[in-house]
Structure formats: C-alpha cells, structure tokens
C-alpha cells in the first residue's frame, strides 16, 4: 500500500491532488447501519474531490455518488463462513496489487490503514445473546483478530465508547490508537415538519387511532432488538395504546403468535419491511428499542430528529448521546416491567409537552455533514501519519 506522494494532507488539498482511497465492506447496499455509513462517507469524500472506490463482494446498481467506483471481489465460496474468509483474502491480494493512498476498512477484512468499528465484536454479540459462537461467528472473530493485530493498522475509529471498550477487551487495541466518533443522522430526511403530510397519510392508511398513544418498534433482527420484551411490556400497560412493528425478520410469524398468546394482537400492527422509517418515526409517540446488543443504534437518533422520544437500554451505544429529557435508558437485563414503566411515562409526552423540540435540538448536534467532516479529518490525520511513517 505504497502512498502515491510525500506531501501532507493539507498541502494535498491545496494543490488540488486526489487522495486515492478505498472503503472495504463485504456488502454494499442501501439498508443497514454500516451500509448507511459506507454510502454517506463515500459520497462525502467524493464531493470533497477524492478518488473513492468501494471494495465489496456485492453492490447495489448505483453508487452513492457518480464518481464513486466499485471493485467487486466475488470469487467462488461454499457457505457464509467460507465466503467471509475468501473475501478477506481477496481484499488482501487486491490491495497489495493496487496503489491506494489510504484503505479504510469497515468490516470483513484485515488489510487496511484505518479501521472503523461500527458493528461491535462477534465475541460480545454472542455473549449478549447468551448463545455459543457459530462457525460464522468464529470466522468473523478470526478476521477481527487479524484486523486488529499489532501492525495491522495505524488507527481505529469507533462509533461508541461501548465498542471502543469491547475491542480493547477482545483484541487488546491500545486506547491511544482509538478515536470515538458517534454516528450521524440526516436531519433533512428525518424532519417531521417536511414529511408531516406523508406521515399523516400513512397513519390513516394503516388505520391508527389518533387519540391513542402509538409506540413504534423498528429494526432488523427482532430477537437482538428485543421485540419479545417489547410485546411483553406492551401487554402490561394500563393504558389503551397501539404498537407498530416495522422491519425485516425471517421468523416474523413466531412474534405474531407471541402477540396472540399475550392477547394483544388487535393492538399490534406488523408492517414488515418498509424503507420509509422517517414516516414511522414521525407518526409515533415513542420509539422503543430494548436491544440486547447494539454498538450504537442509528434509529435512536433518527427518531429524535423526527421529534420522537426514545427508550433503549444500557446495551445500546447511543445511550452515550442521550439525556433524560428526551429518552429513557433501562437496565441491560431488559426487564419488561421496567420497560412498561418507561413506555407509560412517554405515552403522552409528545402530545402534552415540548419534548419534540428538545429531541430535534439534540439531533441537530449530530447532523450528518458535521459528523462526516469529523470522520474525514481523522482519515486525513491517518494519511499524514502513514506518509510520515513511509519517510522514516
């Protein structure tokens, strides 16, 4: 990974030269938290004039910016575990044969100059779900070990102090080599005033009662996100409320049956996947994410941006940016009684107080452009570090 010049980043920008940078992630798509970061970061750097390539195994039809290129490494593999390892090996080979100035790893590889931890660690994920590590998890853990081995990187960016602590524990990454930059929110997309009409139309379309509190559960992977705990807590409420469930889940039928067994099926609306989360955050009175493991949780601050208070847990990295005026953070054991108490507290606050203004104000401090600039400056600092290392 030999750098193409010996000038500093600041001089590079003044001279109008491009930094040839690659972002590495197994999957490019327009859904998922890490994928959201990948697209926004690639777009931002392309707008800065950098030469941006996304190295991946699969990608969507269109890049996040017209000038962003794809390098697709999709060799033959058998099963998910083999696919992960083969991709990491293919990235290693491709990078060695290329002349990138900076390689930014987002996951699933060990060849990079700077690494971002956006999905936590496989070890802590398994522990949080109280499950043994599967073969895929063990392969992921091995890739993580190589990715964070001494000499494998110049610096690590973490999206929460929670994740930073986990990589220190699991992979012995020195504290001084970690920078924490919390996630961002697109405050233009997630703006209740802008989409108020669409949210009202959706509320009418799915026949929600405007006179009853609306709780929202939204996310992919219902077990980890805590849907059973949400349904149980909802069944304990002494108020007449509604629960909307949005997301992608292979075993959705099991959760519908669980709601039926609790006798709350008539108050629950299972919507399946919907790529308009901003509408749901806007129509809801409270967003509920009682997660068992969440390195950060984009949805928490997306909810705030739409003026909707949230409930999450000590297992969620987003707790680091929250305050009691806009949210409740319940214990790591995700006790349904504690969750029900928090839900009852927030049921009418959006209608009776100025909490929406407070939510929006907090979200604006995490606007996407502001946070991406912090990330960009950190990458430039690593690039300078790499240049200095090459000259010694």
Which ranges hold each PLM region?
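Short hydrophobic beta-strand element within catalytic cores of glycosyltransferases
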Residues: 309-312
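Carbohydrate-associated surface elements
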Residues: 162, 184
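Glycosyltransferase donor-sugar binding loop
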Residues: 57-59, 185, 218-220, 242-255
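A conserved mid-protein helix/loop that constitutes part of the nucleotide-sugar donor-binding site
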Residues: 36-40, 213-236, 253
